[in-house]
């Protein structure tokens, strides 16, 4: 991670951490780097989610880009994976997403895709950070006809939906599904896509007001969807997050289907069809032990990376694997896209369900998960840095994991996107792992937060 760019772009509270001044500097730095690397006036797409601060940050970012000579094409509210796809379809030099994904509305972020549809390499982000650090001092600003122009595109959602329809290539006739769009960026595409595939659809979380993105809805708040599915007699439920780069689901009984389960189901299907490249699925250290053991039983290899879809993607690209993702619902299908895509993932899962002739609860029951306790400890940047340097705390955590022996594991890490230290304890004995997590959290509070 760089000074400003975390695992998923620049993130923070809009107007406080991520200011208009910062957005303009990012725009100027990005335009300068792209002009230098391409040798021409760059074309840059901008998409955003439904946060109230999105318009403000887009205006500042656009001003920065145009002031150094880049042309901007505004896509409006679109999913993050739509930008990753459209930057390639429209032969743009880069695509920018203004979103904080699953985070509350007061947060926002700026993430940049290269013209290839992949996130910018670290070295390019470092070049942009250098411009930010020196306030773009000495950077020649455009004048006259060299100033960038701004146009608005209205064809993005249709082109993206056409791409999804062709990639899913399925018939969902006979399925009755409830879809939660998190009051975010997925609604327009989802309302076109899933009925077009033949499903009977009921949509919730489709009334964004700038403030209610991810608020009690979407993939981080499945309760409402699970209740709606059971009460409405739906075959299953699908939930996206605010920018639709992740997807979780629930079966007809209201039981959650997490990213691990989705990856397992899709990977098994790909293996049957002979398209599971390398016979491997790439996951992160957060994946459940029950998932890992099940995949072994199916003869499918798993490779683990650090938490973050960018690390999953790096491994997939380096080794030629076709599927990877995270327990949180990021699933990357490299045969079709360059990033996590919630709507593509949902379509593939629903296609599998429709062809199986089985209930979603039967698919959901392919393996039993080990109990898992997750606790987030609020921590600022200084506290996160102190945690990384605390040898006494590291020894304490290692000792706690040893107490679980082969029946569980402990993972403590600092979040790359939020002001938190995340504590995860997993094992067969729920009471034991709950106590273990409590002891670790208490020790973190004692040494780092309150100390």
Give the residues covered by each predicted segment.
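Proline/glycine-rich low-complexity loops and linkers
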Residues: 75, 126-161, 166, 252-325, ...
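Short glycine-centered, acidic/aromatic-flanked micro-motifs in structured strand/loop junctions
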Residues: 47-49, 179-181, 251, 335, ...
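N-terminal small/polar loop signature for handling phosphorylated ligands or for N-terminal nucleophile
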Residues: 32, 36, 40-107, 192-250
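Gly/Ser/Thr-enriched, mixed-charge loops and adjacent short helices
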Residues: 13, 108-232
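An N-terminal, well-structured beta->alpha segment
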Residues: 1-63, 67-68, 150-175, 384-385, ...
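Short glycine-rich phosphate-binding loop at a beta-alpha junction
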Residues: 39-49, 73, 176-178, 279-285, ...
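Phosphate-binding and adjacent anionic-ligand microenvironments
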Residues: 236, 273-451
């Amino acid at each position: 991670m760089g000074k400003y760019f975390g695992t998923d772009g620049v993130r923070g509270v809009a107007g406080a951490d991520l200011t208009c001044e910062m957005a303009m500097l990012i725009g100027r730095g990005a335009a300068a780097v792209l002009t230098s690397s391409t040798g021409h006036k760059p074309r840059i797409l901008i998409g955003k989610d439904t946060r109230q601060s999105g318009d403000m940050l887009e205006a500042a970012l656009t001003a920065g880009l145009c002031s150094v000579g880049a042309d901007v094409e505004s896509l409006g509210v679109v999913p993050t994976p739509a930008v990753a796809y459209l930057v390639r379809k429209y032969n743009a030099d880069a695509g920018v997403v203004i979103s904080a994904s699953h985070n509350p509305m007061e947060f926002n972020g700026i993430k940049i895709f290269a013209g290839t549809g992949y996130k910018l390499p670290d070295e390019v982000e470092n070049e942009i950070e250098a411009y930010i650090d020196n306030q773009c001092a000495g950077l020649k600003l455009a004048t006259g006809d060299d100033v960038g122009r701004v146009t608005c595109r209205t064809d993005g959602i249709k082109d993206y939906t056409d791409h999804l329809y062709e990639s899913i290539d399925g018939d969902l006739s006979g399925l009755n599904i409830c879809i939660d769009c998190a009051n975010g960026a997925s609604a327009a595409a989802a309302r076109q896509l899933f009925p077009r595939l033949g499903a009977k659809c009921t949509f919730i979380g489709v009334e964004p007001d700038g403030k209610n993105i991810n608020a009690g809805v979407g993939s981080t708040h499945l309760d409402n969807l699970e209740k709606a599915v059971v009460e409405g007699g739906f075959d299953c439920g699908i939930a996206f997050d605010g920018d639709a780069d992740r997807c979780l689901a629930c079966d007809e009984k209201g039981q959650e289907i997490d990213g691990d389960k989705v990856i397992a189901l899709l990977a098994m299907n790909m293996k049957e069809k002979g398209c599971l490249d390398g016979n491997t699925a790439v996951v992160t250290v957060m994946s459940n032990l029950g998932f890992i053991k099940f995949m072994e039983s199916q003869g499918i290899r798993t490779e683990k990376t650090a938490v973050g879809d960018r690390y999953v993607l790096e491994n997939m690209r380096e080794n030629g694997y076709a599927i990877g993702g995270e327990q949180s619902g990021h699933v990357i299908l490299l045969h079709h896209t360059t990033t996590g895509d919630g709507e593509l993932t949902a379509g593939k899962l629903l296609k599998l369900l429709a062809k199986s002739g089985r209930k979603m609860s039967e698919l959901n029951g392919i393996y039993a998960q080990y109990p898992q306790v997750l606790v987030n400890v609020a921590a600022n940047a200084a506290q996160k840095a102190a945690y990384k340097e605390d040898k006494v705390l590291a020894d304490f955590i290692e000792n706690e994991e040893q107490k679980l022996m082969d029946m569980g594991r402990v993972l403590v890490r600092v979040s790359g996107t939020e002001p938190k230290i995340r504590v995860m304890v997993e094992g067969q004995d729920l009471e034991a792992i709950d106590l273990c997590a409590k002891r670790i959290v208490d020790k973190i509070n004692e040494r780092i937060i309150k100390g």
